[in-house]
A protein has these predicted regions:
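Active-site-adjacent pocket scaffolds in enzyme catalytic domains
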Residues: 1-72, 126-128, 139
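C-terminal domain-boundary segment and adjacent tail
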Residues: 55-139
């Protein structure tokens, strides 16, 4: 918090972003989820894995989140690593899931910073205003 970070992604404890407050400063927690290439390829950077099965898993995860979003907001943080999905045999799978996601209505592709800023400005606006640090004039 003291070094200007906007968000953290260490928690597995929630499904949706939430606020951490300490010492009058606020940090958005963007909870991690087991979605992405590390889980489906089991962090095997050089093993072949099975890109076809991985794509089916990713589509099923995304489709469920998208269906749930019709009832209430969802947060689906897929994590892709260049050393895992950037391999020639896996890049096509990555392109395929992105194309699948782009076909769905109401999907926002955003960085962690963009999501955290949106949470502060829109979702947690009232909470953030209460916890915002006060500016003090220097003498």
């Amino acid at each position: 918090m003291e070094h200007g970070y906007l968000f953290n992604s260490n928690s597995f404890s929630h499904d949706l972003p939430f606020l951490w407050e300490a010492g009058g400063r606020v940090l958005v927690e963007l909870p991690r989820q087991p979605f992405g290439d590390g889980r489906t390829y089991q962090h095997r950077a050089n093993d072949a894995g099975n890109p076809h099965d991985t794509l089916l898993i990713w589509k099923a995860m995304f489709d469920e989140f998208h269906e749930e979003s019709r009832v209430s907001p969802t947060y689906c943080p897929f994590q892709f690593h260049p050393y895992i999905s950037g391999r020639p045999g896996r890049a096509k799978t990555l392109r395929s899931i992105i194309q699948h996601m782009k076909k769905a209505d109401g999907v926002w592709f955003a960085t962690g910073s963009e999501v955290a800023r949106w949470c502060l400005d829109e979702v947690f606006k009232a909470e953030h205003a209460k916890a915002a640090p006060r500016k003090v004039a220097a003498s």
